[in-house]
A protein has these predicted regions:
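Long, low-complexity or tandemly repetitive, helically biased scaffold regions used
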Residues: 1-154
Length: 154
């Protein structure tokens, strides 16, 4: 058992946190370098992952016109799907901003409660994300030509 896992075990006993293996599997907390501010560092690790997905789906909600990949992928989503993606984007942003707030408050009990909640929420969010990530991937399997693709962009 490494230092991170030992410190997490203490915190878990004190605050009834999710199992180390489960949270590590999702957010790779065992890669943290120091157990000194473990709760805050775990939340920051979660935030790093959220920011990545916020960027990915944010590009579907508001694609960068200079990005060929963004413009290509977005055309495979219906308006209803884009609305759902926007709602997912908002959900991710809310979690991200909550992490920032909880870290700033520096209250370990509040951080622990939030960690448990965000882990539970993440398992549902992940399912939603996967649906859109798969569709993005599948868009690249569609047959098209460079002329068709670039003509679509104007």
């Amino acid at each position: 058992m490494n230092e991170i896992e030992k410190e997490y075990a203490k915190l878990s006993k004190k605050f009834k946190l999710p199992k180390f293996k489960e949270i590590d599997n999702e957010f790779e907390i065992s890669t943290l370098e120091s157990p000194s501010f473990l709760m805050r560092d775990i939340l920051r690790k979660i935030e790093d992952k959220l920011i990545f997905y916020i960027d990915v789906i944010g590009n579907l909600v508001h694609p960068d016109a200079s990005s060929l990949s963004n413009m290509y992928e977005v055309r495979y989503f219906s308006d209803d799907e884009k609305d759902d993606i926007y709602n997912l984007f908002k959900k991710l942003m809310k979690v991200d901003r909550n992490i920032i707030e909880v870290v700033l408050k520096n209250d370990e009990k509040e951080q622990a409660a939030f960690l448990s909640k965000v882990f539970e929420d993440w398992m549902e969010i992940k399912k939603e994300l996967l649906k859109y990530i798969v569709k993005m991937k599948e868009s690249w399997e569609k047959q098209s030509t460079i002329e068709e693709d670039t003509a679509y962009f104007g």
